[in-house]
C-alpha cells in the first residue's frame, strides 16, 4: 500500500505506547484513524492530542478479549468512515511468569488479549477490507519474544502464535491484494509492565505479586531497565508506516536480539544435521 493518505485505519491498544505511536504515524501520513482501547480516559486523551494536529481521528472503547466488543468497534468504524483499509492488531498485555507460577486466569487473559483478539480482528476486519476492492494491509504486533523464548511462557506462546498466524496469513491474503506484516519489537518505552491496571474482573488472579528475590526479581529489573532505555513509540510508529507502504513481512525495532535469533536457528539446523544421511524407517 504505497499511498496511505485518505485510507482508513483501525488500531487497537491505541491509547498509549506503540499503538498511539502507530496511530500518530498513520494520521500524519494522511490516514483516517479509529483509535481503540480498553482504557477509556487515556483513549479520549489520545484522540484529543491527535485532533489538535488536525488529524481525522475518532475513538471507540473495546475490550478486545471479547469478540462481541471488537465486532461492535468494527461496526462503529464503518458507521464513522464507511471503509477500512488498514487493521493494526496491537493491543497486548505482559502475561505470566515461568513454570510454577502459572494460573488458569493468567493464561486466559494473556492468550485472550495477545492472540485470540488478533484472530478475531482478522476474522472481523478481513472481509471489510476485501469488500471494497481497494486493497489493504494488516499489521499484528507480536514481539521479539515471538522469535526467542524467555521466562514469561504464556507471553511467549501468545507472541509465537501471532508470528505464525501472520506468516500463514500473508500467503493467504496476497492474491487478494492485502498485505500482512508482523511487528516484533524489542524494548520500547511503554507501560506494558503495568498491564494489570486494565485487568477485567473475569480474569481475577491472572497477575501474581512480583517476587522481590531470586531470578524473577533480577529478570524484572532487567526488563524495567530495558524498557526505560527502549525506543520511542513514535519511532516504532514510523517503522510500521514504512512497513505498510513497502509490504515488509517482518518489522523490527532494533538489532539488539539479532544474534539470539541466529543462535536459535543455528540450534534448529543442528537438529537436522544430527539425522542427516539417515533413512527414515517407513
Q: What does each model-identified segment do?
A:
Residues 143:
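Residue(s) in the substrate-gating loop at a strand-loop-helix junction
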